[in-house]
Amino acid sequence: KITIGNSVLFGPHVFIITGNHQVNQIGKCIIDVEKKTERCDADVVIEDDVWIGAGTIILKGVRIGRGSVIGAGSIVTKDTQPYSINAGNPCRKIRMRFTDSEIEEHEKRLRP
């Protein structure tokens, strides 16, 4: 399942992948494996006020924190901290968008 919050901006060619294939079944080609285990799939959550740059790939089980920015071409394999700016392969935190006091003020203005 994919959950997308409010005021989320997507660049072109963003992929969100919530599943994977079971690759460790002895005696079967990957294409012939019919049964998936629970750990093959996991939800993706994109919280409010997020910007995801062009060509980003978001893998299963990831939560993109409120107010985060994901740089173009990133491969997101882990959760992001709210109000962080992230980029790369694998995606990692570059810096915060705001200071703690600025986050508090931003939240007050968005949700009076």
Question: Where do the protein language model's features map onto the residues?
Answer:
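Flexible, glycine/small-residue-enriched loop-and-beta-strand segment within the central core
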Residues: 1-60, 89, 95-98
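Short, basic/aromatic-enriched C-terminal tail that caps enzymatic domains
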Residues: 94-112
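Short, highly charged low-complexity linear segments
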Residues: 27-29, 71-73, 106-112
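C-terminal/domain-terminus segments
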Residues: 58-87, 91, 102-105
